[in-house]
C-alpha cells in the first residue's frame, strides 16, 4: 500500500492511498466464494453453482462492496502508519477504480491540533471568601415564606402585591386581536407581567369594577405586529386577594421535609443548604476563571468537524429544553457556533492538561462528591448506592472530579488572590464568559 500526505492547511490533510490490485482481487474472490456457498440459482444444486456463473451474476456487486470496505480499512491503516489523528470522517474521492488495476483514492480530512498547554503562571484568579451569617439565614427564611405566599380574598380596593382575578378584552382600532383577551386570569399587581400601565391602572380597583385602560405596546415587544401600537383594554375585576405569609411553624417546616425540630432545627437545615450552595458557587466561579485563563493563554485552531458536531448537540439540547414542534436541524447553526467553538477548544485544552500532568480521577473525591450530592435527599445512603451501581452515572461524576483536579493543577501555578465578600455577592451568578 502506497501512502502520501499533503498538508492543505493547519489542520486539513489530503492523503493519497494506493491499494494493490492483488489485494482487491483477493477480497473480491473471497466475497464471490461466500456468495457461491449460499446462492440459489435454478438448474443448480445449492453450493454447486459454477464459479463462472457466480462471477457473471455477482462480480459487479461484490467488487463494489469490496472497494468500499477496502477504502475504509486502508484509510485507518494509512492514518496509523502516518501517525495522524483524524477529527471526523474523511471526504473520499476515487482516482482509479478500474478492474485489474490498483485502487487509488484521495481522502481529505481534518486532524486534531498538536499543542502543549502553557502560560499557567500568568493566569490570575480572584477567589471569593464568604460566610453564611444569621442575617443571611433570616433573609432566606423571608424568601422561602414569600415563595409559599397564600392569597385570601378581601373586600377592599386593590393595592400592589395583591392578586386580582380578572377578565379582559384588548382591542386595536376597535378590533379584538389574537392573544389580547382572557377570562379568570390571576395577576399580582407589581409583578411586571403585563405591559407598562396595565397593572398600575388596576391599583385602587374593587371586585365587580370595570376599568378601561388606554395603553401602548412597547417598541421592543416580542410580537412585532403589536409593537408600538396603541390598544384599549376593558378589564373586569372579579376578586381582590391579599398576600398572607405562612407562619414559621411545624406545618411550614414540613413543606421542606423538616419535622419535629422546631425553628432552631429548621434554621440549621436552611443554613446547611446555604453553606453547600456557597461552596458550590465559589468553586464554580474559580473554575470559570481558570477555564477563561486557559483559553486566553492557549489560543488554538480547532477542526470544523468537531465544531459542527458540537453545534448539532447544542441544537438537540435546545429542542429538548424548549420543546415545540421543531427539528434540531431547523435551528440556524450560527446561533450555536460561538458556544460550540468555546466548548471544543476548552475540551481539547482540558484533555491536554490531563495528559501532560498524567491526571486520573481521585476515587476518594468521587465518593465525597456523591455523598455531598446525596446529602440533599431524604435517603442519602440509597442515592450513594445507586451511583456506585450505575457505571454511566459514576463515570459522569469521575469526569467532574477530573475537571476539578485540572482546576487544582492550574491553581498551583496561577496567581490566586482571596477576596472577602458577603454571602449574597458570593452566590450571585457570574457574568457569561465571552466566546473564544
Curated annotation (Swiss-Prot):
It catalyses: [protein]-peptidylproline (omega=180) = [protein]-peptidylproline (omega=0). It is found in: Cytoplasm. GO terms for molecular function: peptidyl-prolyl cis-trans isomerase activity; protein folding chaperone; ribosome binding. One of its GO terms (biological process) is chaperone-mediated protein folding. Residues 161-246 form the PPIase FKBP-type domain. The keyword Metal-binding does not apply. Keywords: Cell cycle, Cell division, Chaperone, Cytoplasm, Isomerase, Rotamase. Its EC number is 5.2.1.8. It is an enzyme of class 5 (isomerase). It comes from the Bacteria. Its main location: cytoplasm. GO terms for cellular component: cytoplasm. Involved in protein export. Acts as a chaperone by maintaining the newly synthesized protein in an open conformation. Functions as a peptidyl-prolyl cis-trans isomerase. Belongs to the FKBP-type PPIase family. Tig subfamily. Consists of 3 domains; the N-terminus binds the ribosome, the middle domain has PPIase activity, while the C-terminus has intrinsic chaperone activity on its own. This is Trigger factor. It comes from Pseudomonas paraeruginosa (strain DSM 24068 / PA7). The lineage of its organism: Bacteria, Pseudomonadati, Pseudomonadota, Gammaproteobacteria, Pseudomonadales. The gene is tig.
Amino acid at each position: 500500500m502506497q501512502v502520501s500526505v499533503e498538508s492543505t492547511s493547519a489542520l486539513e490533510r489530503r492523503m493519497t492511498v494506493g491499494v494493490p490490485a492483488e489485494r482487491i482481487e483477493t477480497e473480491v474472490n473471497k466475497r464471490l466464494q461466500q456468495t457461491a456457498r449460499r446462492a440459489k440459482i435454478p438448474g443448480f444444486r445449492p453450493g454447486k453453482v459454477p464459479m463462472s456463473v457466480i462471477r457473471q451474476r455477482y462480480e459487479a456487486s461484490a467488487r463494489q462492496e469490496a472497494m468500499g470496505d477496502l477504502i475504509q480499512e486502508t484509510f485507518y491503516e494509512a492514518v496509523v502508519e502516518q501517525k495522524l489523528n483524524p477529527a471526523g470522517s474523511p471526504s473520499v474521492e476515487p482516482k482509479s477504480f478500474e478492474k485489474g488495476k490498483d485502487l487509488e483514492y484521495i481522502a481529505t480530512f481534518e486532524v486534531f491540533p498538536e499543542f502543549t498547554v502553557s502560560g499557567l503562571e500568568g493566569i490570575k484568579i480572584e477567589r471569593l471568601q464568604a460566610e453564611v451569617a444569621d442575617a443571611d439565614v433570616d433573609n432566606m427564611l423571608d424568601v422561602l415564606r414569600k415563595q409559599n405566599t397564600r392569597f385570601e380574598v378581601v373586600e377592599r380596593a386593590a393595592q400592589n402585591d395583591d392578586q386580582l382575578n380578572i377578565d379582559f378584552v384588548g382591542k386595536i382600532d376597535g378590533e379584538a386581536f389574537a392573544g389580547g383577551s382572557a377570562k379568570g386570569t390571576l395577576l399580582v399587581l407589581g409583578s411586571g407581567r403585563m405591559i407598562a400601565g396595565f397593572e398600575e391602572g388596576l391599583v385602587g380597583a374593587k371586585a365587580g369594577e370595570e376599568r378601561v385602560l388606554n395603553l401602548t405596546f412597547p417598541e421592543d415587544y416580542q410580537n412585532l405586529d403589536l409593537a408600538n401600537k396603541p390598544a384599549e383594554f376593558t378589564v373586569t375585576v372579579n376578586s381582590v386577594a391579599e398576600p398572607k405569609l405562612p407562619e414559621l411553624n411545624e406545618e411550614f417546616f414540613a413543606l421542606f421535609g423538616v419535622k419535629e425540630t422546631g425553628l432552631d432545627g429548621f434554621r440549621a437545615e436552611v443554613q446547611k443548604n446555604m453553606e453547600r450552595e456557597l461552596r458550590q458557587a465559589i468553586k464554580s466561579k474559580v473554575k470559570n476563571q481558570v477555564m477563561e485563563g486557559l483559553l486566553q493563554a492557549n489560543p488554538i485552531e480547532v477542526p470544523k468537524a468537531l465544531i459542527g458536531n458540537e453545534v448539532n448537540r447544542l441544537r438537540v439540547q435546545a429542542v429538548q429544553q424548549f420543546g415545540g414542534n421543531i427539528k434540531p436541524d431547523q435551528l440556524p447553526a450560527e446561533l450555536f457556533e460561538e458556544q460550540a467553538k468555546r466548548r471544543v477548544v476548552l475540551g481539547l485544552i482540558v484533555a491536554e492538561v490531563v495528559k501532560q500532568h498524567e491526571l486520573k480521577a481521585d476515587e476518594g473525591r468521587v465518593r465525597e462528591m456523591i455523598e455531598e450530592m446525596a446529602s440533599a435527599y431524604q435517603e442519602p445512603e440509597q442515592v450513594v448506592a445507586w451511583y456506585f451501581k450505575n457505571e454511566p452515572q459514576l463515570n459522569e461524576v469521575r469526569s467532574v472530579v477530573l475537571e476539578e483536579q485540572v482546576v487544582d493543577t492550574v491553581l498551583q501555578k496561577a496567581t490566586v488572590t482571596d477576596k472577602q465578600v458577603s454571602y449574597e455577592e458570593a452566590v450571585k451568578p457570574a457574568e457569561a464568559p465571552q466566546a473564544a
